[in-house]
């Protein structure tokens, strides 16, 4: 059930009429990656890759969170974005 809601939430993000902030996008990215991949075990990007480094750090902050917990948090976060930006 949570997986279906997670997939539906991922689709809702695509239909937002206004662009969320960069911080909100990073949070979405981190929760999505934690829910779908698990803990970040990739190499940290170099100093000059600012975007990649920000995404890596956001995902790394989710380390230890279960897939189901990350999915539920993602769903709740998307609901807030829909209320704010739809």
UniProtKB/Swiss-Prot annotation:
Tissue expression from the record: Expressed in larval and pupal brains. In adults, expressed in cardia, part of the Malpighian tubules, fat body, and gametes of both sexes.
Q: Which interval of the chain is the signal sequence?
A: none
Gene Ontology MF, one: fatty-acyl-CoA binding
Which InterPro entries does this chain map to? Acyl-CoA-binding_prot_CS (IPR022408), Acyl-CoA-binding_protein (IPR000582), Acyl-CoA-binding_sf (IPR035984), FERM/acyl-CoA-bd_prot_sf (IPR014352)
Alphabetized UniProt keyword annotations: Lipid-binding, Transport
Q: Which SUPFAM superfamilies match?
A: Acyl-CoA binding protein
Q: Which residues bind an acyl-CoA?
A: 14, 29-33, 51, 55, 74
Query: An example of a Gene Ontology BP annotation on this entry?
Result: intracellular acyl-CoA homeostasis
Q: Pfam family of this protein, just one? A: ACBP
Domain ACB: start-end pairs: 2-86
Lineage: superkingdom = Eukaryota
- Which protein family is named in the record? Belongs to the ACBP family.
* Known role: Binds medium- and long-chain acyl-CoA esters with very high affinity and may function as an intracellular carrier of acyl-CoA esters. May be involved in energy metabolism in a manner that depends on the substrate used for energy production. Dbi and its metabolites are involved in the regulation of multiple biological processes.
Check the record and name the PANTHER family matching this protein: ACYL-COA BINDING PROTEIN 3, ISOFORM A-RELATED (PTHR23310:SF137), ACYL-COA-BINDING PROTEIN, ACBP (PTHR23310)
Please state what the protein is called: Acyl-CoA-binding protein homolog
Q: Which gene encodes it?
A: Acbp2
């Amino acid at each position: 059930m949570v997986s279906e809601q997670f997939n539906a939430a991922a689709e809702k993000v695509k239909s937002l009429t206004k662009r969320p902030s960069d911080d909100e996008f990073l949070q979405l990215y981190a929760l999505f990656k934690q829910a779908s991949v698990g803990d970040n075990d990739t190499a940290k990007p170099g100093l000059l890759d600012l975007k990649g480094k920000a995404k890596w750090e956001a995902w790394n902050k989710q380390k230890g969170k279960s897939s189901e917990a990350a999915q539920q948090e993602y769903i709740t976060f998307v609901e807030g974005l829909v209320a704010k930006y739809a």
